[in-house]
């Protein structure tokens, strides 16, 4: 157990060496746990050997630092959960998801079919979802709603058969391409599932989801 009076200089000594050299000196590591003649003191009454050299005591402050760091992480997670559930964090997460979808669409390294863009707009009336699905028709798209999730599945298979171009080439070639898209969108609880509408036109899927609060609203005349 280290004394409190020697904890502070040991901390700054270790922090300086680790920060400047990226680790402990080789001399300290090679002599770790070995008391030297200058630092070894023997108690005649008990016969216990003690060393006062703290340069060979690695990772003392690291345990304290990791403990404090984990407490800060727990506090951050608690604040994030409070913000998410109390201040409508779902809409911010939807925005982040839209940004990542755009990045995936722009920087995708795969050739051919790339991840379609998805736009989600929420208002007092309801939710409007727009998905770009080039090369798909309405027969290739399936939409279902379960457990608060709107699931969009699109699958398109194309088979191309190339006939022999000359008498020497008597074997025909066949090429098959597969385009698949799956996405699940978390919807709020105040929506009317029975009034969900989906329209597919020129490779663009538009989904309209009204909210219960807007559908059930009535106008009251003032007399």
Swiss-Prot record:
Q: Where in the cell is it found?
A: Mitochondrion
CDD domains per the UniProt record, alphabetical: ACD_sHsps-like (cd06464)
Q: Name one GO biological process term.
A: response to hydrogen peroxide
Q: What is its main location?
A: mitochondrion
**How is this protein named in the record?**
Small heat shock protein hspI, mitochondrial
Q: Which UniProt keywords apply?
A: Mitochondrion, Stress response, Transit peptide
Signal peptide annotation: none
Q: Which family does it belong to?
A: Belongs to the small heat shock protein (HSP20) family.
- Define the transit peptide region by residue numbers: 1-23
Please give the SUPFAM superfamilies that the UniProt record associates with this protein.
Answer: HSP20-like chaperones
Q: Which domain of life is it from?
A: Eukaryota
PANTHER family linked to this entry:
26.5 KDA HEAT SHOCK PROTEIN, MITOCHONDRIAL (PTHR46733), HEAT SHOCK PROTEIN 21, CHLOROPLASTIC (PTHR46733:SF4)
Instruction: Report the GO terms under cellular component.
Output: mitochondrion
Q: Where is the sHSP domain?
A: 109-223
Database matches in Pfam families: HSP20 (PF00011)
GO molecular-function terms, A-Z:
unfolded protein binding
